[in-house]
Amino acid sequence: MATIFSRIVAGEIPCYKVAEDDKFFAFLDINPMVKGHTLVIPKQEVDYIFDLSDNDLAAMQVFAKKVALAIGKAFPCKKVGQAVLGLEVPHAHIHLIPMQSEADMLFSNPKLKLSPDEFTEIASKISAAM
């Protein structure tokens, strides 16, 4: 059974795609902490990020860096934070979150409720900054 993220990559479940290459995929978190909150995943279905090969883990970080730099251009912030939790979906993923303060990285914070138009606009802004 494919994970929800594999189904997103396959186009079976819609998403707000930000970036993609042959190995990795970036899309907006549908329960964002702040505008611009993006997930980066390997297309390869791996549950635990540290089960990726060293080369794939390094390549995922380089891909995430490109996305993070674009997020920072699209949503001016002090830094783009990175978090890896990995308990909520059994598919390795990196959260990229534009931060004004460390409080923006608290996953216990209430999530934003955005409209489809807002999500589309956010994804477009980040993609355009790539």
Q: PLM features: residue spans?
A:
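HIT superfamily nucleotide-processing domains
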Residues: 1-130
